[in-house]
Amino acid sequence: MRELQRLADQLERSWDGDAWHGPALGELTQGLSAAQAHRHHLAEAHSIWELVLHCTAWVREVSRRLGGTEPSLPLEGDWPEVGEQSEAAWEAAREALKEAIRGLARAVREMDPALLDRTVGEGRDAPLGTGTTFYVMLHGVVQHNLYHAGQVALLRKLA
């Protein structure tokens, strides 16, 4: 399997797939009501819904970077607000994350492999994910999804 295919596969597994780490974001968020997803179980901790919106924003930001956009915080914001709290809005948030991940995986499969060695942005800014290669950034977005999947798994137990 070529490297781009492996990266795309790992991205997709962060949403739904036979992942070694355990349940992926799709499985972890499936079957939750809007109220369960929006509940704040811990003071100063994000809700499951907020985590889904945050992951979506960053997956989209990485997609924009692959398309040639200069790195910045996501257009949606680092932690987008939930807004309407309906079942339809919750399902739309889940669907948006799934589609963002699938779209990024498609873009990775189609990208020029030479881009993997190019540097993202000008200087090192760890929270922004710059100053590393596209290869590291793509692994980083997978790691980011899985980090938050762990949080969702814990919050789901409290739901």
Feature annotation, model-predicted:
Residues 82-121, 135-141:
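Acidic/histidine-rich alpha-helical segments that form the ligand environment
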Residues 1-22, 26-29, 34-81, 121-159:
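Short, contiguous alpha-helical
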